């Protein structure tokens, strides 16, 4: 088994690839298979942001592994105006939905309840297969409502770490 504990800086070469959907890239503990069909165990530090497409990991045996975002069923949302798109983003954010933001569009994981809401808001919703790369969020690190022990969840804003738009 290829055992992985560490994220590393980008590398020019790698020995294996992990093709993972967003849910799998969000887990700190995961058993999966590499593209080369090798059994892999991920044991990453808890509380970190999800793995991103193109991120690199280092296995215990020294091998470098590249993470690839596997295409998955998404809703691609467009609207007839910037106001309507902003309103759709507001309502999705109010539901704490993981959201990928592009120039004039939004993408989110397929969900029939959210599709019905978006339809009611007048959005155009198209089902597509694509890699899902949602925003990390302004505060990153996790989602907590509890006030008990909140000093453990005092994350500084990460506004400077938003991904590059394509």
Swiss-Prot record:
- What are the protein's UniProt keywords? Chaperone, Cytoplasm, Nickel, Nickel insertion
Matches recorded under Pfam families: UreE_C, UreE_N
Kindly report the protein's main subcellular placement as a broad class: cytoplasm
Q: Name one GO molecular function term.
A: nickel cation binding
Q: Which InterPro entries does the annotation name?
A: UreE, UreE_C_dom, UreE_N, UreE_N_sf
Q: Which locations, inside or outside the cell, does it occupy? A: Cytoplasm
| Any one GO BP annotation for this protein | protein-containing complex assembly
Q: Does the keyword Cytoplasm apply?
A: yes
Q: Does the keyword Chaperone apply?
A: yes
UniProt xrefs under Gene3D superfamilies: Urease metallochaperone UreE, N-terminal domain (2.60.260.20), UreE, C-terminal domain (3.30.70.790)
N-terminal signal peptide = none
Q: Which CDD domains does the UniProt entry name for this protein?
A: UreE
Q: Which GO terms describe its cellular component?
A: cytoplasm
Cited function: Involved in urease metallocenter assembly. Binds nickel. Probably functions as a nickel donor during metallocenter assembly.
Q: Which family does it belong to?
A: Belongs to the UreE family.
* Name by which UniProt lists this protein: Urease accessory protein UreE
